[in-house]
């Protein structure tokens, strides 16, 4: 291991929404994230391993065991990469699990599902409600109500309680 960098980010957002009916909705949104980046050098190759995690909670999320596991994972990944062969190229099936792939889906598909894009009619999905826009077997769900998860909230930015919503 040649170099280790750890980055801790923490924020607390306080929001208050007033609607036209005079209803006030408030929320406090803590968010914390720790990233561990390791550079390993072996046989003339320098490779990187990254691990970490976060949640909508406070510093208590980072137990000694959890942080050590992230560090070990980053080291393992960096060292393993120094021995890795090039990945095959070409078209192949991809399976995405829960968690971070949600960011990829959000960037690739999610922005086109946001209300402002539909209001401006700039989304590829404009006018597609009720139509199939993905192959059978593909389901994309937005669930902002999962406790403690980075994308979870008590209420959205309009003051509406979050829920599980099937997008596609």
Model-inferred region functions:
Residues 1-153, 160-161:
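Active-site bordering "gate/hinge" segments
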Residues 157-168:
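Long, well-ordered mid-to-C-terminal structural blocks that present hydrophobic/aromatic surfaces
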